[in-house]
Protein backbone atom coordinates (compact mmCIF):
# COMPACT_ATOMS: atom_id res chain seq x y z
CA UNK A 1 0.00 0.00 0.00
CA UNK A 2 3.01 2.27 0.33
CA UNK A 3 4.04 1.80 -3.30
CA UNK A 4 2.29 3.33 -6.26
CA UNK A 5 1.40 1.19 -9.27
CA UNK A 6 4.23 0.88 -11.77
CA UNK A 7 3.87 0.22 -15.49
CA UNK A 8 5.78 -2.97 -16.35
CA UNK A 9 4.82 -3.21 -20.02
CA UNK A 10 4.42 -0.42 -22.55
CA UNK A 11 1.45 -0.26 -24.89
CA UNK A 12 3.54 -1.87 -27.63
CA UNK A 13 4.28 -4.86 -25.39
CA UNK A 14 7.88 -3.90 -24.62
CA UNK A 15 8.94 -4.16 -20.96
CA UNK A 16 9.80 -1.01 -19.05
CA UNK A 17 13.17 -0.52 -17.40
CA UNK A 18 12.08 -1.86 -14.01
CA UNK A 19 11.01 -5.25 -15.37
CA UNK A 20 13.78 -5.58 -17.94
CA UNK A 21 16.41 -4.72 -15.34
CA UNK A 22 15.25 -7.42 -12.94
CA UNK A 23 15.04 -10.14 -15.60
CA UNK A 24 18.40 -9.17 -17.09
CA UNK A 25 20.21 -9.23 -13.73
CA UNK A 26 18.65 -12.57 -12.84
CA UNK A 27 19.61 -14.21 -16.13
CA UNK A 28 23.18 -12.90 -15.78
CA UNK A 29 23.31 -14.23 -12.20
CA UNK A 30 24.24 -10.84 -10.78
CA UNK A 31 25.15 -11.22 -7.10
CA UNK A 32 25.56 -7.55 -6.14
CA UNK A 33 23.81 -4.47 -7.52
CA UNK A 34 25.80 -1.33 -6.73
CA UNK A 35 24.28 1.87 -8.06
CA UNK A 36 23.76 5.54 -7.30
CA UNK A 37 21.61 6.75 -4.44
CA UNK A 38 19.02 8.17 -6.86
CA UNK A 39 17.84 4.56 -7.33
CA UNK A 40 16.96 4.08 -3.65
CA UNK A 41 13.24 4.85 -4.22
CA UNK A 42 13.07 2.02 -6.78
CA UNK A 43 14.60 -0.60 -4.51
CA UNK A 44 11.32 -1.75 -2.82
CA UNK A 45 9.71 -2.29 -6.23
CA UNK A 46 12.68 -4.30 -7.47
CA UNK A 47 12.69 -6.46 -4.34
CA UNK A 48 8.96 -7.14 -4.79
CA UNK A 49 9.51 -8.14 -8.41
CA UNK A 50 12.18 -10.63 -7.38
CA UNK A 51 9.79 -12.11 -4.81
CA UNK A 52 6.97 -12.25 -7.36
CA UNK A 53 9.14 -14.35 -9.67
CA UNK A 54 10.30 -16.52 -6.79
CA UNK A 55 13.91 -15.50 -7.37
CA UNK A 56 16.59 -14.70 -4.81
CA UNK A 57 17.35 -11.00 -4.91
CA UNK A 58 20.98 -9.86 -5.15
CA UNK A 59 22.67 -7.75 -2.49
CA UNK A 60 21.84 -4.07 -3.00
CA UNK A 61 24.14 -1.15 -2.22
CA UNK A 62 23.65 2.50 -3.06
CA UNK A 63 26.58 4.87 -3.45
CA UNK A 64 26.58 8.63 -2.84
CA UNK A 65 26.48 10.81 -5.93
CA UNK A 66 29.55 12.23 -7.63
CA UNK A 67 29.06 15.98 -7.41
CA UNK A 68 30.00 18.88 -9.66
CA UNK A 69 33.52 20.31 -9.16
CA UNK A 70 31.99 23.77 -8.72
CA UNK A 71 28.57 24.47 -7.25
CA UNK A 72 25.98 21.95 -6.20
CA UNK A 73 24.33 18.98 -7.82
CA UNK A 74 25.20 15.76 -9.60
CA UNK A 75 28.11 15.68 -12.04
CA UNK A 76 26.86 15.81 -15.63
CA UNK A 77 28.21 15.55 -19.16
CA UNK A 78 27.82 19.30 -19.56
CA UNK A 79 30.15 19.92 -16.62
CA UNK A 80 32.85 17.99 -18.43
CA UNK A 81 32.21 19.78 -21.72
CA UNK A 82 32.33 23.20 -20.06
CA UNK A 83 35.42 22.56 -17.95
CA UNK A 84 37.33 20.41 -20.41
CA UNK A 85 37.47 17.03 -18.70
CA UNK A 86 35.96 13.70 -19.80
CA UNK A 87 32.93 12.12 -18.16
CA UNK A 88 32.53 9.05 -20.38
CA UNK A 89 35.00 6.14 -20.67
CA UNK A 90 35.03 6.46 -24.47
CA UNK A 91 34.32 9.26 -26.90
CA UNK A 92 30.58 9.98 -26.95
CA UNK A 93 28.86 11.41 -30.02
CA UNK A 94 25.43 13.03 -29.94
CA UNK A 95 23.51 15.51 -32.07
CA UNK A 96 24.83 18.23 -29.76
CA UNK A 97 28.45 17.37 -30.50
CA UNK A 98 31.30 15.13 -29.39
CA UNK A 99 32.34 14.59 -25.78
CA UNK A 100 35.86 13.21 -25.43
CA UNK A 101 36.35 10.06 -23.39
CA UNK A 102 38.97 9.04 -20.88
CA UNK A 103 40.65 6.79 -23.45
CA UNK A 104 40.93 9.57 -26.03
CA UNK A 105 42.29 11.99 -23.42
CA UNK A 106 45.06 9.55 -22.55
CA UNK A 107 44.02 8.35 -19.10
CA UNK A 108 45.22 4.94 -17.95
CA UNK A 109 42.26 2.69 -16.98
CA UNK A 110 43.87 1.68 -13.69
CA UNK A 111 44.42 5.34 -12.76
CA UNK A 112 40.76 6.18 -13.36
CA UNK A 113 39.61 3.19 -11.30
CA UNK A 114 41.90 4.24 -8.45
CA UNK A 115 40.62 7.82 -8.56
CA UNK A 116 36.95 6.80 -8.65
CA UNK A 117 37.41 4.28 -5.83
CA UNK A 118 38.54 7.10 -3.53
CA UNK A 119 35.53 9.28 -4.30
CA UNK A 120 33.65 8.71 -1.08
CA UNK A 121 35.76 5.80 0.23
CA UNK A 122 39.09 5.18 1.92
CA UNK A 123 40.74 2.28 3.69
CA UNK A 124 41.16 4.18 6.96
CA UNK A 125 44.71 5.33 6.16
CA UNK A 126 46.30 8.17 4.19
CA UNK A 127 47.15 5.82 1.32
CA UNK A 128 45.95 6.97 -2.10
CA UNK A 129 47.55 4.69 -4.69
CA UNK A 130 46.01 1.22 -4.94
CA UNK A 131 46.59 -1.43 -7.56
CA UNK A 132 43.54 -3.24 -8.91
CA UNK A 133 44.50 -6.26 -6.82
CA UNK A 134 44.73 -4.12 -3.67
CA UNK A 135 41.36 -2.52 -4.34
CA UNK A 136 39.78 -5.94 -4.90
CA UNK A 137 40.92 -7.11 -1.47
CA UNK A 138 40.67 -3.82 0.45
CA UNK A 139 37.48 -2.17 -0.81
CA UNK A 140 34.66 -2.48 1.70
CA UNK A 141 31.19 -1.00 1.21
CA UNK A 142 30.98 -0.38 4.95
CA UNK A 143 33.57 2.38 4.58
CA UNK A 144 31.73 4.21 1.79
CA UNK A 145 30.71 7.69 2.90
CA UNK A 146 27.04 8.63 2.93
CA UNK A 147 27.53 12.14 1.58
CA UNK A 148 28.40 12.93 -2.02
CA UNK A 149 31.98 13.58 -3.17
CA UNK A 150 33.03 16.45 -5.42
CA UNK A 151 34.73 15.47 -8.65
CA UNK A 152 38.21 17.05 -8.81
CA UNK A 153 39.58 17.07 -12.40
CA UNK A 154 43.07 18.09 -11.25
CA UNK A 155 43.22 15.23 -8.75
CA UNK A 156 42.14 12.92 -11.55
CA UNK A 157 45.12 14.10 -13.63
CA UNK A 158 47.40 13.72 -10.59
CA UNK A 159 46.47 10.05 -10.34
CA UNK A 160 47.27 9.55 -14.01
CA UNK A 161 50.66 11.21 -13.50
CA UNK A 162 51.44 8.86 -10.61
CA UNK A 163 50.67 5.82 -12.74
CA UNK A 164 52.60 7.25 -15.68
CA UNK A 165 55.86 7.77 -13.77
CA UNK A 166 55.60 4.25 -12.31
CA UNK A 167 55.58 2.71 -15.78
CA UNK A 168 58.88 1.66 -17.34
CA UNK A 169 60.56 3.94 -19.84
CA UNK A 170 60.45 1.12 -22.38
CA UNK A 171 56.67 0.70 -22.09
CA UNK A 172 56.07 4.44 -22.39
CA UNK A 173 58.44 4.69 -25.35
CA UNK A 174 56.36 2.11 -27.23
CA UNK A 175 53.23 4.17 -26.55
CA UNK A 176 55.02 7.35 -27.62
CA UNK A 177 56.37 5.84 -30.85
CA UNK A 178 53.21 6.25 -33.00
CA UNK A 179 52.89 9.88 -31.87
CA UNK A 180 56.46 10.63 -32.96
CA UNK A 181 55.91 8.79 -36.24
CA UNK A 182 52.79 10.84 -36.94
CA UNK A 183 54.55 14.12 -36.13
CA UNK A 184 57.75 13.43 -38.06
CA UNK A 185 56.61 10.97 -40.73
CA UNK A 186 59.80 8.98 -40.14
CA UNK A 187 58.83 5.82 -38.28
CA UNK A 188 61.66 3.77 -39.83
CA UNK A 189 64.28 6.24 -38.61
CA UNK A 190 63.11 6.30 -34.99
CA UNK A 191 65.39 4.37 -32.64
CA UNK A 192 63.47 2.86 -29.72
CA UNK A 193 66.57 3.14 -27.48
CA UNK A 194 66.78 6.86 -28.22
CA UNK A 195 63.07 7.23 -27.56
CA UNK A 196 63.44 5.40 -24.24
CA UNK A 197 66.16 7.85 -23.13
CA UNK A 198 63.98 10.80 -24.10
CA UNK A 199 61.02 9.42 -22.15
CA UNK A 200 63.21 9.03 -19.05
CA UNK A 201 64.02 12.75 -19.21
CA UNK A 202 60.50 14.12 -19.70
CA UNK A 203 57.98 11.82 -18.04
CA UNK A 204 58.20 13.52 -14.63
CA UNK A 205 56.74 16.65 -16.23
CA UNK A 206 53.82 14.95 -18.00
CA UNK A 207 50.35 13.81 -16.97
CA UNK A 208 49.69 11.94 -20.22
CA UNK A 209 51.70 10.22 -22.93
CA UNK A 210 50.09 12.54 -25.47
CA UNK A 211 51.89 15.45 -23.76
CA UNK A 212 55.30 13.93 -24.52
CA UNK A 213 55.62 15.50 -27.98
CA UNK A 214 55.23 19.06 -26.73
CA UNK A 215 57.85 18.35 -24.06
CA UNK A 216 60.34 16.75 -26.43
CA UNK A 217 59.81 17.93 -30.02
CA UNK A 218 63.23 19.64 -30.02
CA UNK A 219 64.88 16.21 -29.84
CA UNK A 220 63.50 15.49 -33.31
CA UNK A 221 63.29 18.91 -34.96
CA UNK A 222 65.44 22.02 -34.77
CA UNK A 223 63.75 25.14 -33.37
CA UNK A 224 61.83 27.17 -35.93
CA UNK A 225 61.55 30.13 -33.54
CA UNK A 226 63.24 31.37 -30.39
CA UNK A 227 61.56 32.52 -27.20
CA UNK A 228 61.62 36.34 -27.34
CA UNK A 229 62.26 36.78 -23.63
CA UNK A 230 65.05 34.21 -23.67
CA UNK A 231 66.57 35.76 -26.81
CA UNK A 232 67.29 38.93 -24.81
CA UNK A 233 70.12 36.98 -23.17
CA UNK A 234 71.82 36.85 -26.58
CA UNK A 235 74.41 39.62 -26.14
CA UNK A 236 76.89 41.24 -28.50
CA UNK A 237 79.68 38.84 -27.51
CA UNK A 238 77.46 35.74 -27.67
CA UNK A 239 78.02 34.82 -31.36
CA UNK A 240 81.80 34.62 -30.88
CA UNK A 241 81.42 32.63 -27.67
CA UNK A 242 79.16 30.17 -29.49
CA UNK A 243 81.71 29.83 -32.31
CA UNK A 244 84.37 29.07 -29.71
CA UNK A 245 82.03 26.53 -28.13
CA UNK A 246 81.66 24.79 -31.49
CA UNK A 247 85.44 24.37 -31.63
CA UNK A 248 85.40 22.78 -28.18
CA UNK A 249 82.58 20.40 -29.12
CA UNK A 250 84.32 19.42 -32.35
CA UNK A 251 87.30 18.13 -30.37
CA UNK A 252 85.23 15.78 -28.16
CA UNK A 253 85.38 12.13 -29.23
CA UNK A 254 83.41 10.58 -26.35
CA UNK A 255 80.21 12.51 -27.03
CA UNK A 256 78.33 11.50 -23.88
CA UNK A 257 76.55 13.77 -21.42
CA UNK A 258 79.04 13.57 -18.53
CA UNK A 259 82.10 13.93 -20.76
CA UNK A 260 80.67 16.86 -22.71
CA UNK A 261 79.64 18.66 -19.52
CA UNK A 262 83.06 18.17 -17.91
CA UNK A 263 85.01 19.40 -20.94
CA UNK A 264 82.76 22.41 -21.60
CA UNK A 265 82.84 23.54 -17.96
CA UNK A 266 86.62 23.12 -17.75
CA UNK A 267 86.95 25.28 -20.88
CA UNK A 268 84.71 27.93 -19.29
CA UNK A 269 86.74 27.95 -16.07
CA UNK A 270 90.06 28.22 -17.94
CA UNK A 271 88.77 31.17 -19.92
CA UNK A 272 86.89 32.75 -16.98
CA UNK A 273 83.57 32.64 -18.81
CA UNK A 274 80.45 32.91 -16.64
CA UNK A 275 77.86 30.11 -16.71
CA UNK A 276 75.09 32.38 -17.95
CA UNK A 277 77.13 33.56 -20.93
CA UNK A 278 77.33 30.03 -22.31
CA UNK A 279 74.60 27.82 -20.86
CA UNK A 280 71.59 30.02 -21.64
CA UNK A 281 72.56 30.77 -25.28
CA UNK A 282 73.60 27.12 -25.69
CA UNK A 283 70.19 25.87 -24.55
CA UNK A 284 68.37 28.51 -26.57
CA UNK A 285 70.23 27.35 -29.69
CA UNK A 286 69.21 23.73 -29.20
CA UNK A 287 65.69 24.05 -27.77
CA UNK A 288 64.44 27.50 -28.73
CA UNK A 289 63.66 28.23 -25.07
CA UNK A 290 65.30 28.08 -21.65
CA UNK A 291 63.21 25.20 -20.34
CA UNK A 292 63.71 21.48 -20.75
CA UNK A 293 65.73 18.51 -19.48
CA UNK A 294 69.39 18.61 -18.48
CA UNK A 295 71.23 20.46 -21.25
CA UNK A 296 74.02 17.95 -21.77
CA UNK A 297 71.57 15.05 -21.94
CA UNK A 298 69.94 16.88 -24.84
CA UNK A 299 73.34 17.36 -26.49
CA UNK A 300 74.19 13.66 -26.22
CA UNK A 301 70.86 12.52 -27.65
CA UNK A 302 70.72 14.83 -30.66
CA UNK A 303 74.42 14.21 -31.37
CA UNK A 304 77.48 16.30 -32.27
CA UNK A 305 76.54 17.10 -35.86
CA UNK A 306 73.01 18.28 -35.02
CA UNK A 307 74.23 20.22 -31.97
CA UNK A 308 76.77 22.18 -34.00
CA UNK A 309 74.26 22.73 -36.81
CA UNK A 310 71.75 24.28 -34.40
CA UNK A 311 74.35 26.53 -32.78
CA UNK A 312 75.41 27.77 -36.21
CA UNK A 313 71.80 28.49 -37.14
CA UNK A 314 71.25 30.46 -33.93
CA UNK A 315 74.41 32.49 -34.56
CA UNK A 316 73.15 33.54 -37.99
CA UNK A 317 69.51 34.02 -36.89
CA UNK A 318 69.63 35.80 -33.53
Which residue ranges define each predicted feature?
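Charged catalytic carboxylate motif
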Residues: 45, 111, 241
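Active-site cores that bind ATP or allylic diphosphates and position pyrophosphate for catalysis
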Residues: 1-82, 86, 98, 123
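Helix-rich, typically C-terminal accessory recognition domains appended to large enzymatic cores
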Residues: 256-301, 306
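Catalytic adenosine-cofactor/nucleotide-binding cores of aminoacyl-tRNA synthetases and other
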Residues: 54-225, 287-318
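Short, charged/polar micro-motifs that form catalytic or ligand-binding hotspots
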Residues: 36, 102, 268, 272
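Long, amphipathic alpha-helical coiled-coil segments characteristic
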Residues: 229-260, 264
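A short, ordered amphipathic alpha-helix with a cationic face
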Residues: 36, 145-149, 165-170, 234-236, ...
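Generic structural signal for isolated residues within well-ordered alpha-helices
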Residues: 48-49, 134, 266, 297
Amino acid sequence: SLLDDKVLFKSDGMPTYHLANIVDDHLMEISHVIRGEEWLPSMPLHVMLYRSFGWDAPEFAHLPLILKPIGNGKLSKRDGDKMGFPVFPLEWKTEEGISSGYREKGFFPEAVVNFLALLGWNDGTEKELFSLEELATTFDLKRVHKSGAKFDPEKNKWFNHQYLIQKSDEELAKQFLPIVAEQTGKIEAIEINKLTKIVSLIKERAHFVNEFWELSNFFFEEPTAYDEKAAKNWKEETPQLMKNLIEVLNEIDDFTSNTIETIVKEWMIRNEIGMGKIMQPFRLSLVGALKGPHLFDIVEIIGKEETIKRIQKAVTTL
